[in-house]
Amino acid sequence: MALAVSFAVASAEPTDAGDGFVRAEGRELVCGGEPYLIKGMAMGNDVWNNPSAAPAADHDESAFQELAAMGFNSVRFYLNYALFEDDADPYRYREEGFGWLDRNIRWARANGIRLILNMHYPQGGYQSQGNGDSLWKEPENRNRLAALWGEIARRYADEETVIGYGLVNEPMPVGETDARDGLRVWQELAQQITDEIRRYDTRHVIFVEKVLGVRDPKTGETDWNLPFEEQFVPIRDDNAVYEFHTYDPHSFTHQGFDWAGRGGTAETYPNDELYASGVSWLAFTAAGRARAGSTDWQPVSGGLISVTDPNTNAVALCFQASGIGKDASVYADDLWIDVFDEIGELIRSVPCETAEYHGNFSFWAQNGEGSGTVSSRYGYDDRRSLCIKGTTGDANMTLIRLEHTPGQRYRVRGYVRTEGAAASSLIALRLDSYHAQSIQEGSRDLLLASVRDAQAFSRKSGRPVFCGEFGAGIHCFEEGRGGERWVTDSIEALKECGIGFNYHAYYDGAFGLYYEKNGKRIRNDVLEQVFRDHIAD
């Protein structure tokens, strides 16, 4: 699918932004003729709970004072459409919501902070968790979103405190023909919104995010693995910035959160784990199959596996559980990949899930049903195992563990236990092969590689890029796990590449500088010190 617009196309009528406005110029943002690097913090404003009234507990003016003192110059300010428009009365706008926004703009202006207004929760639903398909399937939702942005632009066209407008947070468009067609759908909506904004406002920056994933309209499956630069869509506008988010490695930054599939996990940074990005699945070879009717731990293994696809540069251990049933659970433990040379001599045995080593497996389900977690109920060699439960279609838990060297062969082995699995189910261990654009250990080089992908896109397109979100969850700062080192390395990597950034978030139960614990508002003092040491120039 070819997009109808290139990144090189500019607006037919470039405008003079004036000294007080931030605007895009080449690959930079500038203000008053000088380069402007965004150093921002997110304010979440309770958008995920879909509030109908302005949030009171998130922050007050003192938050802007505090951020300025730490060296921040901006806030990515999250919006939920419901503060400004009622579903029962579309296209009529609520002054309560705009009064709240006016108040925050005054607070920001008084403390030397600028705002990026970000539509985090648009009509049709929050995008990031994949529940916002109605934005893409119902044209009226898209029309309402464009109209709301037009109203915002009309009101704030002359407001220099506002840097610009983030059209949709982490879009996950649904294609009309297939998943990849979602790129066209997002491009058309982004252009529709931009055109509506430009009816009233020619001076503020438009922030266009790359897609988080694209969804197939027939199967509902999401393609998460488009090449990085193909995840961006161009718009016709000379004052646009292209936005990406990074939480690499996800298994570290999201550790301990059930909603992210990382419940019960603990990981440190830096580490010598392998993290593959831009991965494309190539093939699998079954190593051995477990019996569905047995509740004992069964040894599962197979013969030597040769990798035949020449594009393979990474291999994974995969625990597959297909069609086990809604009430069934299957477990796997003591999982290994044995590596052999060309003549069949054992080189080494690599642990994937053992008493001493706990791999960061990812879960996938063909129809979205079931779960893949770490269980403390059973274990073959300890009180821990992988657990897949409630899957009615194909599902697996996978760990990309090794870089592939041509000529090497592999054997996968481990133990599996079943509970209530259907007799027709497929429960197996297998070796999967992948091609990855990048394979890095969990170090500063990994973070820098993620940022350099965006830098390369900026050089190729000639447009500015912006890291709209990065952050480490609160569990990353426990027990010497290295959260402060991750944040420091991320900030320095972004600065090294000359890319503006925004930390997620000021007040948030999972990622906040402030969060709630036992009914009390807690500040992450370690994180605050990182900001004081590294945000200011």
What is the role of each PLM region?
Residues 11-74, 421, 441, 445, ...:
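N-terminal carbohydrate-binding accessory modules
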Residues 276-441:
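Extracellular and organelle-lumenal recognition/adhesion modules and their flexible linkers in secreted
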Residues 56-126, 144, 186-203, 207-209, ...:
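Aromatic-lined substrate-binding rim segments of carbohydrate-active enzymes
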Residues 56, 147-150, 154-157, 161-162, ...:
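Extracellular glycoside hydrolase catalytic/binding regions
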Residues 1-6:
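Bacterial N-terminal signal peptides
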Residues 284-285, 338, 360-370, 374-376, ...:
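Aromatic-rich peripheral "rim/lid" segments of glycoside hydrolase catalytic domains that contact
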Residues 37-43, 73-79, 83, 114-118, ...:
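Structural recognition of the beta-strand scaffold that forms the well-ordered cores
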Residues 47-54, 81-99, 123-140, 173-179, ...:
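Surface-exposed, active-site-proximal loop segments in enzymatic domains
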